[in-house]
Amino acid sequence: MFALLPGVAGAAGNSVTGKNVALIGDSMTWIGGDSCDIARGWTSHFRLLASPASMNVYARSGATWTNAPDTKVDTEAFYDVLHDDNVLYTQAVRLVIDVCSGVSRCPDLIILYAGANDAWFASRRPGIFTAGSTTADGSLPASLAGSVRAVCGLLRENLPDSRMILVTPAQMTKAPASAVERVSAVIDSVGCSLGIQVIRTDRDGPINAAEERGRHPRLTSDGIHTNPEGAAELARFFIREIGRYSEE
C-alpha cells in the first residue's frame, strides 16, 4: 500500500469519491486491467486512493486520438496494437452505447488520457497536424485537433451531465520531447476552447524522460509504461489536479 501525499485524501473526497468514472485512452490506462487492479497501471492506485463508486475502462493499448485517413468506426472489433481503427472516437461510441442501453451507469467523470501514440507514431497519422476539414471515412476528422474536438463533441452531446477531463501524455523516451509537447499543446488548446479541464502531464506530471533513460528507469518499465511506483505517482498527481480544478 502506498502512503497518501498531503492533500490527496481531501482532493479525492471532494471530487471523485463515490462517483462513477469512465476511462478512455491508450495503454497507459489499459495496463491497469479491466478491473483496475494491476499495480503497474495508474488506475489501480486511483481506485484505492480516490474510492470511486465504479471505474469502467474503455481504453485500448495502441489507441490514438488522431483518426487515420481510412479509419472506420467498428465497435465490435478489438485491437490492442496500433491500427487505423484503434482510436478514441470508437471508445467514446462504445461508452455512449453502453450508457444508452443500460449496460453501464452514466459516468459522473470521464477521463480521456491519450496522446503517447500520436507522438510516437505520428507518421502513421498523416493528417495529425493539418488544419481544415480533412476527414476520414467521410465524417471523422483526420487531424489531432479535429479528432479531439469530435470525441468531446460526441460525449458532450450524448452524455451532457458527465464531466470530462483531458489528460496529455507523460514524458517518455520513445518519442522526441518536441513531439510530446506538440501533441500536448494541441490537446490543451482544444480543451481550453471547449471549456474542458486539461491536465498537462507532459509539463507538470511526475515522469521525467531524462530519468527514464538508461538501464534503470525510475518510474517506468520501458521509458513509457509505468512501473508500480510510477503508476502510484501518476494516480496521486491526477487526484491532486482533479481536486484542484474542482475547488477553483
Stretches found by the model and what they are:
Residues 34, 73, 169-248:
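Catalytic His-Asp segment of secreted/periplasmic serine-dependent ester chemistry enzymes
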Residues 18-22, 30-128, 133:
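Conserved SGNH/GDSL esterase-like catalytic core that processes O-acyl groups on lipids
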Residues 1-4:
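Bacterial N-terminal signal peptides
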Residues 47, 51, 115, 153-160, ...:
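Sec-exported extracytoplasmic/periplasmic mature domains
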Residues 113-117, 149-184:
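Active-site segments of SGNH/GDSL-like serine hydrolases
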Residues 24-27, 58-63, 112-117, 167-171, ...:
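Active-site-proximal beta-strand/loop segments in catalytic clefts of secreted hydrolases
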Residues 117-142, 170-182:
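Serine-dependent acyl-ester chemistry module
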Residues 9-10:
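Cleavable N-terminal signal peptides
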